[in-house]
């Protein structure tokens, strides 16, 4: 417990093109070494590719992909009487979004396409179609929670 109280959550500004805070968070996640311009070019380029491939608004496809990636349950280690149990807990909405964005960027970087723009676009498309590494990660997390359902009564 901090003595001075909790810090306030800073709100991000909505991005100028899509007027969406989640897109800004994606840009911040993609950004390396403070190069926001490069990150914006990657994200907006990827969104253009997504719109061209699906013939739907890119933001719509992105939101669908985010919904498919966001985890509902996760496991947290809890030590009780010398044994460590993996206790399933519900994921808070802010953390859900943060995890989904983190997985999307991590697995985009790990892909084999030539440019980051292509990688991100294809990861978004895969996630929207319920395939891809980030969706698999969410499903693995849910399987872990399901397997450890017996320890749910040790909740925090």
Swiss-Prot record:
InterPro entries: Ribosomal_uS7, Ribosomal_uS7_bac/org-type, Ribosomal_uS7_CS, Ribosomal_uS7_dom, Ribosomal_uS7_dom_sf
Gene Ontology CC entries for this record: small ribosomal subunit
Keyword RNA-binding attributed: yes
Keywords: Ribonucleoprotein, Ribosomal protein, RNA-binding, rRNA-binding, tRNA-binding
GO biological process: translation
GO molecular function ontology, one term from the record: structural constituent of ribosome
Domain of life assignment: Bacteria
Transmembrane segments: none
Short name of any one Pfam family annotated for the protein: Ribosomal_S7
SUPFAM superfamilies in the record: Ribosomal protein S7
Biological role: One of the primary rRNA binding proteins, it binds directly to 16S rRNA where it nucleates assembly of the head domain of the 30S subunit. Is located at the subunit interface close to the decoding center, probably blocks exit of the E-site tRNA.
Family classification: Belongs to the universal ribosomal protein uS7 family.
Subunit structure as annotated in this protein's UniProt entry: Part of the 30S ribosomal subunit. Contacts proteins S9 and S11.
Name recorded for this polypeptide: Small ribosomal subunit protein uS7
């Amino acid at each position: 417990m901090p003595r001075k109280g909790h810090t306030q959550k800073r709100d991000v500004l909505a991005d100028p093109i899509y007027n969406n805070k989640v897109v800004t968070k994606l840009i911040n996640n993609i950004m390396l070494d403070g190069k926001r311009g490069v990150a914006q070019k990657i994200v907006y380029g990827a969104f253009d590719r997504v719109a061209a491939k699906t013939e739907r608004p890119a933001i719509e496809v992105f939101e669908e992909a985010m919904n498919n990636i966001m985890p509902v349950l996760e496991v947290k280690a809890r030590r009780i009487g010398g044994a460590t149990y993996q206790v399933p807990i519900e994921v808070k909405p802010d953390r859900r979004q943060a995890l989904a964005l983190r997985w999307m960027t991590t697995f985009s970087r790990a892909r084999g396409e030539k440019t980051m723009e292509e990688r991100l676009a294809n990861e978004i498309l895969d996630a929207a179609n319920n395939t891809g590494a980030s969706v698999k990660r969410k499903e693995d997390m849910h399987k872990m929670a399901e397997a450890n359902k017996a320890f749910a009564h040790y909740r925090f």
